[in-house]
Amino acid sequence: MRLILLSGLLLLGTFLVNGHDADPEGEVLNSVLLTLMKLQKEFTNLFHAFLTVHKARSFGSGSERLYVSNKEIKNFEALKVICKQAGGQIPSPQLENQNKAFANVLERHNKEAFLVVGDSGNFTNWAAGQPNKADGTCVKADKQGFWHSTSCDDNLLVVCEFYFIL
């Protein structure tokens, strides 16, 4: 959208530099200005619609991060690829409300899913007796949101995290 606006401004600048010989009444210039104004209004409407949907999606969980499943069952390596292609990342809840939002997805699907805890800051939600490296080097969350060591080869629910910085 911004590219279209910039293109319109470039056209406007071209008309201003070349003078008004080709458009003595200013019809083309007025048309370009009108189109730019319509595009700006459309961009603003789309931006507000996006914000409304984002706020609605995050309202119930209290988290600005969205956790979404495509209902597939995959191992950790496949999950990395899927989340990256979708524009998200492997879940990495860093606050209790984020972990709760993630756990809500798992509870709804009655499944477990991988997560990354390396950058979780001060928040952890390890189950009793965990982490246990003997179980594996990856981490999964159960349906209640408790974390467990697991094998990266396990096949778990695909859940990706999406975080919008506005």
From Swiss-Prot:
Task: Please give the Gene3D superfamilies that the UniProt record associates with this protein.
Answer: Mannose-Binding Protein A, subunit A
Q: One GO molecular function term?
A: carbohydrate binding
Summarize tissue expression.
Expressed by the liver.
Looking up InterPro entries in the UniProt record yields:
C-type_lectin-like, C-type_lectin-like/link_sf, C-type_lectin_CS, CTDL_fold
Q: Which residues form the signal peptide?
A: 1-19
Residue ranges occupied by any C-type lectin domain in the UniProt entry = 46-161
S-S bridge residues: 83-160, 138-152
Q: Which keywords does this Swiss-Prot/TrEMBL entry list?
A: Calcium, Disulfide bond, Glycoprotein, Lectin, Phospholipase A2 inhibitor, Secreted, Signal
Q: Which GO terms describe its cellular component?
A: extracellular region
Where is the protein found, in the record's own terms?
Answer: Secreted
Q: Does the keyword Glycoprotein apply?
A: yes
Any matching Pfam family: Lectin_C
Q: Which residues are glycosylated?
A: 122
Q: What does this protein do?
A: This phospholipase A2 inhibitor binds directly phospholipase A2 in the presence or absence of calcium.
How would you summarize the oligomeric state and partners of this protein? Homotrimer; non-covalently linked.
The record's comment on protein family reads: Belongs to the alpha-type phospholipase A2 inhibitor family.
Q: What is this protein called?
A: Phospholipase A2 inhibitor A4/A5
